[in-house]
Amino acid sequence: MLPDRESLTVEFKSEQRRPQSDDEIVDNVVALANTQGGTLYLGIEDNGIVTGVSEQHSNINGLAAFIFNKTVPQQTTRIESFHEHGCQVVVIEVDNSQQIVSTSNGKTLQRRLKADGTPEVVPLFVSQ
């Protein structure tokens, strides 16, 4: 069963108008890993309506390899695909990391809740 809304550990990504960029997907995986872990759903609108994933992200093996190669330290994710209301949804499960995770291009991100209770991705500043 799909969650009905986003939270600190649940993120919906729409691909109805345009595919998410690969960088946007990796940014969200990094943010989830640096917070509490969680689940990224591709093909679901922010309001929970299923609209389907793009062809670009329907290959789950390629997506897993891409995420692994674009995270430091490399993150292993669990990815599955299913159909809901005739639309393909891709689910990316991200574990909470025991060490700080960054993108391969140096972005370190985390998730937090805004005052209205909705989640956002923000920079994670690490002390040297």
Regions found by a protein language model. Give the residues of each.
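Conserved N-terminal catalytic/coupling substructures associated with nucleotide/phosphate chemistry
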Residues: 1-128
